Every structure is written in C-alpha cells, then in structure tokens.
C-alpha cells in the first residue's frame, strides 16, 4: 500500500518534515482510508500516525565555542569575577583542611587556628606546605 499522500498530509498538518512522521504498521488499513486533513488529525490523536520527537545535536558535534583571548571583551575579572575566584579558592582550602583533620594530620585545636587564618593562603599547596606534613 502506498501511503505517501497520507504521510505528506500528516507532515503538513503537524508542521513537521516527512522524516518525523511515522505510521503504525498495525493500523496501515486505517491510514490508507484517510483522505482529508480532518481524517489525518483524527489518526494523529488516536496514535495511528505518530509524530516523532525532534532530534537534537550532541554536545560533541556542536560547533566549538571560540573562547580564546582574542574573543574576550571586558576586563580581567569579567570572565571569572573576583568573588567567584574567592569562593572557588576558599572552598578548596576548607575541603583540604577538613581532609587533613579527618586523616589525623592536624588536631582540632590546629584545625580551628588554621581555619581562622585560611584567607591568608593562596592555594591548597601553600596550606600543605605550612602544615608541613
């Protein structure tokens, strides 16, 4: 059975391309009798004709973003503001300090002292060097 007309009509009614129209193989006889747009709409509602979901493009295939220095506009901190940098650094330091305490490298008293002056360290490696273990 040639259902090309019905498929084209369904695509037009649904406002999609031909590739997104799928006719249920079990209900071919019903679809072949459809002639009008109203018939096609009824078949879409009943599920004899299915409109497939639009296919996306995976992140890997997307065009790569141009993030090089030549594309950047704005100052030094417009891409990564000072506050974001601070949050990233302080969270890393706190995480490392907690790990040191759990591993027994520092005791609770040392932990409190270091936590209070955590802002004076620039990096996790500097904190490790200060503890010296």
Curated annotation (Swiss-Prot):
InterPro entries from the UniProt entry: 60S_ribosomal_eL19_sf (IPR035970), Ribosomal_eL19 (IPR039547), Ribosomal_eL19_dom (IPR000196), Ribosomal_eL19_dom1 (IPR015972)
Keywords on record: Ribonucleoprotein, Ribosomal protein, RNA-binding, rRNA-binding
Native source species: Korarchaeum cryptofilum (strain OPF8)
Gene3D superfamilies: 1.10.1200.240, 1.10.1650.10
Biological function: Binds to the 23S rRNA.
CC per GO annotation: cytosolic large ribosomal subunit
GO terms assigned for molecular function: large ribosomal subunit rRNA binding; RNA binding; structural constituent of ribosome
Chain intervals with Basic residues compositional bias: 60-83
Protein name from the UniProt record: Large ribosomal subunit protein eL19
Keyword check for Phosphoprotein: no
Annotated segments matching region Disordered: 55-83
GO terms, biological process: translation
Family membership: Belongs to the eukaryotic ribosomal protein eL19 family.
Subunit annotation: Part of the 50S ribosomal subunit.
SUPFAM superfamilies listed in its UniProt record: Ribosomal protein L19 (L19e)
């Amino acid at each position: 059975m040639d259902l090309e007309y019905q498929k084209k009509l369904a695509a037009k009614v649904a406002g999609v391309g031909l590739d997104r129209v799928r006719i249920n193989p079990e209900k071919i006889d019903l679809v072949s009798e459809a002639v009008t747009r109203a018939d096609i709409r009824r078949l879409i509602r009943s599920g004899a004709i299915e409109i497939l979901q639009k296919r996306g493009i995976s992140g890997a295939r997307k065009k790569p973003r141009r993030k090089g220095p030549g594309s950047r506009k704005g100052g030094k901190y417009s891409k990564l503001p000072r506050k974001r940098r601070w949050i990233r650094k302080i969270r890393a330091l706190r995480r490392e300090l907690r790990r040191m305490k759990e591993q027994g490298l520092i005791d609770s008293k040392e932990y409190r002292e270091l936590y209070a002056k955590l802002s004076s360290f620039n990096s996790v490696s500097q904190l490790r060097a200060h503890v010296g273990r």
